């Protein structure tokens, strides 16, 4: 059988129908063979019908839950680590950088136009350089570069937002620039909006409740955007100047 894993779902097709099977025979593919754990991610296949002469599988049913998602940790240089459960970790080699360190991660589903396959993309940006890494499995990586006019020499942050049912957007900001870079296709191509943020200094950003929110550490300034392109600045109370990071939770 050929197995395709998408999120928590498996999709199976017959590779070789075999011989000498009978109806209601059951086969098991170990979860460890398809990127998960045994027995939690095993696939149980039930033979529904066979060729009356050869016993080759004609039709089958299957059940099983795929391992969906993993933890990814990033660090200096090419150093990273992944874990399925947060307990056991495996070293992960990230793409090499000419300078700087990988510093910010975001992930989100990408709509590929079908009803069943919606691949997840994890995107990593580095501080001090314009290199961006992206992957659908946090194992095999590709790299791309932010637009040349984007000043990536500072602290850079990426966040993901589902803007509409058809627009899945990654947004990158830097505390060295007012411009905002964004991609709607998982990093394949990038767009830039000039002078989108109220000022430089915005180095932390999060998406939640339908908005991107960025903060300017050490000041009382924050900004928000529903699409990551058009931003509105706001002034927070004086105690806000001590804030250094932001997260959204529900």
Predicted regions and their residues:
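Conserved, function-critical positions that sit in or immediately flank catalytic
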Residues: 1-66
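Surface loop/turn motifs at the tips and blade-to-blade linkers of beta-strand repeat domains
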Residues: 94-98, 146-150, 194-198, 236-239
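Entry beta-strands of beta-propeller and related beta-repeat scaffolds
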Residues: 67-73, 113-124, 164-172, 210-214, ...
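Beta-strand initiation motifs
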Residues: 56-57, 87-90, 139-143, 187-191, ...
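Repeated scaffold domains used in trafficking and secretory/extracellular systems
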Residues: 99-109, 152-162, 199-208, 241-249
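Conserved Ser/Thr-centered positions that define the repeating blades of beta-propeller domains
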Residues: 83, 135, 183-184, 225
